[in-house]
């Protein structure tokens, strides 16, 4: 059986990266929430 996590830097950036988050309203909400929480890393 193939494992579920098959790492790929490109897919990671495209799906969870900063620009992907900023592209949608809810994504911007996530970034804002992580900023308010004082996260060191905002996105992948």
Swiss-Prot record:
Position of the signal peptide: none
Transmembrane segments: none
Gene Ontology CC terms, in alphabetical order: ribonucleoprotein complex; ribosome
Keywords for the protein's UniProt record, in alphabetical order: Ribonucleoprotein, Ribosomal protein
Top-level taxon of origin: Bacteria
One of the record's GO molecular function terms: structural constituent of ribosome
GO BP: any one term: translation
HAMAP family on file: Ribosomal_bL34
Family: Belongs to the bacterial ribosomal protein bL34 family.
Listed name of the protein: Large ribosomal subunit protein bL34
